[in-house]
């Protein structure tokens, strides 16, 4: 066979013309730092494993000790959680640089103070599996149970379920099992590209955000790796400079992999600090979490063939459509739980399904839905704290460009309306001019409370339908 027919690998990818990433603020490159938090989840007979750990430590070429504890190896890993993590935490928080943590669930459970610090810093915590072990020969049903248990422990310890998954020491089944779990916005067990890409999974499209084994401090613990911090810095700088130069035409992402027990050592940490400062000295750089990258890609780069809601996992569906109804993702969740079909793969069909889901809400939920909406040309608009959708909608009707007299009139009508009904005036402004909106205020102020509640809910459905039409593909 000379072609790709029937060949299960994609050797072509984006080819000679990759998509234009469109990172925020015209960034040439997205530089993303990952801290792997594995200490306390590694192979150890205390954890029910057959032997001691032998991977990624100061003891290059170490071998497992069957049935025995390896005290030197244990203390090397302990350095990562006791000292190395906190050095990295200070380094990134002092510079206000976002981080994604690949956190092993059992390691998280053994150092909740570190997890609290991750949350306090606003870092993304993705799951790094249940245990930091080699899954190569693990039966798929066992690995699936481990993934499920990792999500359970992670959610309990971190306070929220992980939306990213990186097993690391993976099996041939890992990626499929991650896609089957259904709750991950991205999987990262790939090193195949400089950009995210879509795979068609067993439950619909799955975003892959490739990771790195080259721009990674693990090479301090590998043959022919980095022997000094200067080598690490030079490699990271060359990687950044190349991608920054390319990025004016074809922006990419640069992942940097870190380990608390490796680069957390003082002699290596200095080189990392120099590199972070070097990146910060450039203007057109975006420094996101991996979840930020995934969400950006989902918004701007749908999978081939566009979005088919009936083929989306609940997590991806809510990510895409959870903001269709203002601050009310429960409507998207209810619509997905009710079951989606080919009929809902159009904007009109999905709008009907989501309106039906909203109608199923309790009176309290509907009241909260109405209250979730901002005043038109109100204080939130002036403070520029509206949602992206509301900002665009109000701008389309010219409500961001009011004269002082117009602003005073809108303010008076907003106040009068709230005083009468106890909730904000809601109208699908994309359908209307400023004059239409002002006339609507005057007309609806005469309604009774029940009629106006029904009118507000109908307008909310109309707003949602218009938003759905604006979603690409």
Language-model region placement:
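Catalytic alpha-helical scaffold of carbohydrate-active enzymes acting on polysaccharides/glycoconjugates
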Residues: 2-207, 233-256, 262-305
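A non-catalytic, amphipathic alpha-helix used as a structural packing/dimerization or gating element
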Residues: 87, 145, 149, 235-238, ...
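A structural motif
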Residues: 202-219
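C-terminal amphipathic alpha-helical segment
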Residues: 221-232
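Charged, compositionally biased N-terminal leader segments and the immediate start
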Residues: 306-326
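Aromatic-anchored, charged helix-turn/loop surface patch used as a conserved interaction hotspot
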Residues: 323, 329, 333-413, 463-472
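Residue-level signal for inorganic ion chemistry
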Residues: 328-329, 425
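C-terminal non-catalytic interaction appendages of large macromolecular assemblies
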Residues: 402, 406-473
């Amino acid at each position: 066979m000379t072609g790709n027919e029937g060949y299960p690998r994609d050797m072509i990818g984006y080819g000679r013309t990759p998509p234009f990433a469109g990172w925020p603020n015209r960034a040439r490159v997205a530089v993303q730092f990952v801290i792997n938090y594995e200490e306390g989840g590694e192979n150890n007979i205390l954890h029910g494993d057959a032997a001691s750990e032998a991977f990624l430590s100061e003891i290059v070429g170490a071998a497992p000790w069957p049935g025995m504890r390896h005290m030197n190896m244990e203390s090397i890993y302990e350095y990562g959680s006791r000292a190395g993590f906190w050095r990295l935490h200070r380094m990134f928080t002092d510079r206000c640089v976002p981080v994604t943590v690949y956190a092993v669930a059992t390691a998280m459970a053994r150092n909740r103070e570190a997890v609290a610090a991750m949350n306090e810093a606003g870092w993304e915590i993705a799951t790094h599996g249940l245990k930091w072990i080699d899954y190569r020969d693990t039966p798929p049903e066992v690995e699936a149970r481990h993934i499920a248990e990792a999500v359970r422990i992670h959610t309990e310890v971190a306070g929220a379920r992980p939306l990213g998954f990186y097993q690391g020491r993976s099996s041939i089944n890992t990626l499929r099992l991650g896609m089957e779990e259904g709750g991950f916005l991205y999987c990262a067990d790939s090193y195949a590209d400089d950009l995210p890409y879509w795979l068609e999974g067993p439950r619909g499209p799955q975003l892959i955000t490739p990771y790195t084994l080259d721009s990674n401090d693990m090479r301090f613990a590998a043959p022919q790796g980095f022997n000094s911090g200067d080598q690490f810095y030079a490699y990271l700088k060359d990687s950044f400079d190349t991608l920054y130069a390319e990025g004016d035409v074809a922006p990419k992402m640069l992942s940097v992999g870190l380990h608390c027990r490796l680069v957390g050592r003082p002699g290596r940490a200095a080189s990392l600090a120099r590199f972070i400062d070097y990146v910060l000295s450039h203007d057109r750089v975006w420094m996101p979490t991996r979840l930020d990258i995934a969400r950006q890609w989902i918004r701007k780069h749908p999978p081939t063939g566009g979005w088919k809601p009936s083929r989306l996992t609940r997590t991806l569906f809510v990510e895409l459509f959870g903001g269709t109804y203002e601050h009310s993702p429960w409507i998207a969740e209810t619509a997905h739980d009710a079951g989606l079909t080919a009929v809902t793969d159009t904007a009109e069909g999905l709008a009907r399904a989501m309106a039906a889901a909203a109608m199923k809400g309790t009176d309290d939920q509907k009241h909260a839905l109405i209250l979730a909406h901002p005043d038109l040309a109100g204080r939130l608009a002036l403070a520029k704290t509206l949602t992206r959708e509301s900002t665009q909608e109000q701008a389309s009707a010219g409500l961001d460009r009011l004269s002082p007299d117009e602003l005073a009139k809108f303010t008076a009508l907003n106040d009068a309306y709230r005083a009468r009904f106890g909730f904000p005036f809601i109208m699908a402004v994309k359908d209307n001019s400023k004059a239409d909106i002002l006339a609507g205020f005057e007309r609806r102020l005469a309604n009774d409370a029940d009629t106006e509640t029904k009118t507000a809910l109908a307008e909310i459905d109309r707003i949602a339908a218009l938003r759905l039409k604006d979603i690409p593909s």
